[in-house]
Amino acid sequence: MTSSKNPTNDNSYFDAVLVGGGIMSSTLALLISEVLPDIKFLIIEKLNAPGSESTGAFNNAGTGHAANCELNYTPLDEKGNLKIDKALSINRSFETSMSLWASLYEAGKIDIKKFLKFIPHISFVSGQDNISFLKKRFQKMTENPEFIDMEFSTSFDEISSWAPLITKDRNPSTQIAATRIGRGTDINFEALTKEYLSLVSLNKNVEIRYKTELIDLMKIDKKQWELEISSEGRKTSIRTGYVFLGAGGKTINYLQKSKIPEAKSYGGFPVSGKWLICEKKDLTEKHNSKVYGKADIGSPPMSVPHLDTRWIDNKKLLLYGPFAGFTTKFLKQSSYFDLFSSIKKNNIFSMLDVGFKNNDLINYLISQSLKSHNSRVENLKNMMPSANPSDWYLKNAGQRVQIIKKTEGGGSLKFGTEIVNSSDGSLSALLGASPGASTAVSIMVEVLEKSVLFLNDKHNLKKKINDLIYPERTASQKNSTFIKEIKKRNNSIFGFHP
């Protein structure tokens, strides 16, 4: 599909329109620009800069989710068996992202120093039951090449050498354990988004409009959508053959406006967040890792505590949290009516059902919102016993909108991400949250392959994507040898030496 197939050949028509200026839309834009450089497409973003909402450095967890240390990705089933399928899938998806970055960096198209730093990922637990779980996890995961470099320790001194703030002022007789993977990362997805869009903007067929909001969209015939957009109070209409909705929490509202049948069963459950942040150099210099703990039994996935080394605006910080909370807004810079406007006659019963089933979760989120500063620091002390309230301040994190989906039993609350596609491939929407940004490349490859943009030349275009991400290799051959080769190649390009 090329811009020469523009049915109207005017400035109001685009082959594709991407709604949202965050990591998802920018990743898709990058892929389109690289493998379909001749198509004419538009990116619209409500705010005045890219990556300012969910992708923002303080709004995104930024871990470089590779399932190295996130214990909620390796749950126990009813029989006590450890399930690592999700961890393997996330790790492979993250390596796909790493592979694309390596290819672009090697070609001189992006600067990895602006968004990527290598830093160890650590899982930390205390108590015999949790230690047994962590050891079982270590044994199971190191059977796979993705996690072969993981270390396990119950030595107080060794764990102190890995993360000294975790053991400072902790009783040495306490039963503790940790795993460590040296090849962890800290990713600034806001900076990465800007790198992507800077590259994409070099393509003369691409237009990026900031301070531009989607108001409404409607399918006007079998091949076209009409979008009403507003820019600084001025409303205009544009047409396109393909729409991608990647506007974070607001995507659910836009998806509902599309009126595609596939949208009818969805709703959204908004969750806010807050960080404790430390800038004191004598502390930031002592902690050089991302440390994940284990959530309390029965608590939701967003309650998993982690103490992260982060680099934001060229400054090294410590972030602890995020502390979840409840709000009716779908974005930080949007309306408190977002949740209410998303309630429709075809999802109201599933949303009410989720509310009744998850009353404990709602109470938990409200209680988290009401915590005092000292109470939050007490939580931090479980991981960092020497924490002093005066060293930390509170900052709002981003909004997440978890997926509510209609089921035979009423409604189900889903944690994760999900792609919604129209049956004809003319519209795609991304819903959900974690692991999100870290797996953006794999997700956007899937979006692109199912879109009308790939309709006429799918085989050739899939090969182009493969060659972009995995030069001289075939992604379909993802065996242990392939995984080892790709990691070795990426390490070499990035200059990482295990």
UniProtKB/Swiss-Prot annotation:
Keywords, ordered alphabetically: FAD, Flavoprotein, Oxidoreductase, Tricarboxylic acid cycle
In short, the EC number is 1.1.5.4
Q: Name one Pfam family in it.
A: Mqo
Q: Which reaction does it catalyse?
A: (S)-malate + a quinone = a quinol + oxaloacetate
Q: Which SUPFAM superfamilies match?
A: FAD/NAD(P)-binding domain
Q: Which cofactor does it need?
A: FAD
Query: Does this entry carry the keyword Flavoprotein?
Result: yes
Pathway recorded for this protein? Carbohydrate metabolism; tricarboxylic acid cycle; oxaloacetate from (S)-malate (quinone route): step 1/1
The main enzyme category here is: oxidoreductase
| BP GO terms, sorted | tricarboxylic acid cycle
Which Gene Ontology molecular-function terms are recorded? Answer: 2-hydroxyglutarate dehydrogenase activity; L-malate dehydrogenase (quinone) activity
Instruction: Name the family the entry cites.
Output: Belongs to the MQO family.
* UniProt-recorded name of the protein: Probable malate:quinone oxidoreductase
Task: Please state the gene responsible for encoding this protein.
Answer: mqo
